[in-house]
Amino acid sequence: MAAGRVAEMGAKVILIEKNESLGKKLLITGGGRCNLTNAEFDTRKFLEKFKGDGKFLFSTFSQFGVKETLEFFHKLGVETKVENEQRVFPASDSSKTVLDALLKYIKKQKVEIILNSPVTDILTSKNDKQKISGVRLKNRKEILARKVIIATGGTSRPETGSTGDGFGWLRKIGHTIIEPTPSLVPIAIKDAWIKKLAGLSLANIKITTFQNNVKQESGKGKIIFTHFGLSGPAILNMSKDIGELLKYGEVIISLDLFPSEDHGMLNTKIQELFKKQNNKKFKNSLNTLTPSALASEIVKISKINPETQCNSVTREERLALVNILKNIPIRADKLLGEEKAIISSGGVSLDEVDFKTMSSRLFPNLYLIGDILNIDRPSGGYSLQLCWTTGFVAGNSTKMEK
C-alpha cells in the first residue's frame, strides 16, 4: 500500500523484502480468507475498538478510512462481501486475491522489488543526526534514500518472517520500543473435556474472566473449541488481558451459553423442554439446546443421573443445570505464544509518531506503519485496516513532507 502510493505520485520506490516472496503474512490472515476490514463506516465508532489508542488515530483515519479502503480495492478488481460482525472478506474467500491485486498495483506503478534481502540497520545522516539516509542490508550493501518507510510488523507468526527485526533497528537510533508480547492469541485450557469438542464453534457466547472469585473482564462473540483449548474472535479479543492475569494466579473463564436470557427465562425454557421430552432420558434431552458433543459434557458436569427421565429431574437439579448453562467454568492454562498469535502488542511508543503523516518525531523523513506501532486492536478486520490506513497516509505524506 505505502510503496504503491509513493510511486503513484511519481517517486522512485524500492521495496525491500527479507523473504523470497511478498505477502507471506497477508496470505494467512483471516484463516487464509483475508479479513480485509470491518464495515463500520463511522470513524469514531471504528476507533472505539482501539480503546485508548484510538485518540492517536483519528487524524490518520480521517484521511483514509474504511470507505476509502473499500473503494481502493474495488478499483483493483477485488469484489468484497460482509459477514458476521461486519467483517469484510474478498468474495473469492481467498487472501491470494488481495495479494495479487496489491502486486499488480505496485508493478503498475513500477516499484522496484528486492527479495531475499534482510535489513540489519537504519542509517542516519552523517551531516544531520535527525535525518535518515537509508538502510544497510545483511550483505553489507547500503541503499540510500530520501525517505524510508518501515513496515516490518511485530513478532507474531515468525514463520512468515515477522520476527520483530524493525524493533532492533529503531532502538539503535533512539526510538522507545514497548516490549512486544503475543496478542489476539488462542488459549490453552487445563480442563481435558474441552479438547473433546475440538472443531466445535459457538456464536454469541458471553465470556467473563475471574481471578480469586473477583470478576475481571467480559466480552461476547464467537468461540471455537480446539485440540488445545479455546480460540475464536471472542477469546482472541480477551487473550491479552487473560495473559496479564495469569501472571498473578489462576484465571477462570466463564462461558454463558445463553447471554440473551436471564436465569428465570432459561429455567422456563428448560421446564418446557422437559415437559416435551417427558419420558426421555436426561442424557438425550439437551441436544436441542446445544450441539450434541457439548450437551454430553454438560450432562457430565451437571451431576444429574444421565439415565433419569426428564419428568423426574428435581427443581433443584434443574436450577443447578440453569446455573451451569449460564456459567461453565473453565481453567485457563497459558497463551499459546507468538507462533499462534494473530498480532503482537508492543512496538514503537505512540508519543514518538506524528499520526497526521505517520512520520517519526525523531526523524521526520522516517515513517512507521502497521504492526510496528504499539497499538492494541481486536480481531475482525481492524489490524489490516490499521495497515491500509497508516500505509496510505505514510505514502501520501512523503510527497507533502520535504
Residue ranges with predicted function:
Residues K18-L22, L27-I28, L36, E40-T43, ...:
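An anion/pyrophosphate-binding glycine-rich loop and adjacent beta-alpha core
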Residues K147-W193:
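Glycine-rich loop(s) and the adjacent beta-strand/alpha-helix scaffold that form part
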Residues M1-L15, W388, A394-K399:
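N-terminal Rossmann-like FAD-binding beta1-loop-alpha1 element of flavoenzymes
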Residues I106-T120, P180:
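A conserved beta-strand/loop element that lines the FAD pocket in flavoprotein oxidoreductases
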Residues L115, S296-D376:
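A glycine-rich dinucleotide-binding beta-alpha-beta segment and adjacent secondary-structure elements
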Residues I16, V119-T120, V135, E142-E159, ...:
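Short hydrophobic core segments
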Residues L115-K131:
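A conserved short coil-to-beta-strand element within the FAD-binding core of flavoproteins
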Residues K18-E112:
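Conserved N-terminal/central alpha/beta ligand/cofactor-binding core
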